[in-house]
């Protein structure tokens, strides 16, 4: 089981060993499956970012991500980042999580997925704020197999 917060900041290496950038964010598709990684690559005016499709990631280790070639890096305008973990138009981080009875469980602090098998989200780490995290710790909400019982709202 891997978490998104661990991936952010990791170097992205090409197969030849050169560094292509660092992971800045993770992009999701319309079904909230991991679809791409957003690179923090030095661009002067920052109107565009580089992204790599998750299918082009050759290896996802504890210390780095490896992609096959520079050709898999694609430049996209920053305003086209729709669903991401922390920097897009719709951010998964800090979204509130409610039960079907309307009780708030907390806010999303991290996301868990199975790295080698697939890109489906398998759980969330929830926070109630800094003091609650310090005194009580964060809670994990591990999803049952499949995402039938989970619905993500607009806000």
Predicted regions and their residues:
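Peripheral interaction segments used for macromolecular assembly
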Residues: 1-155
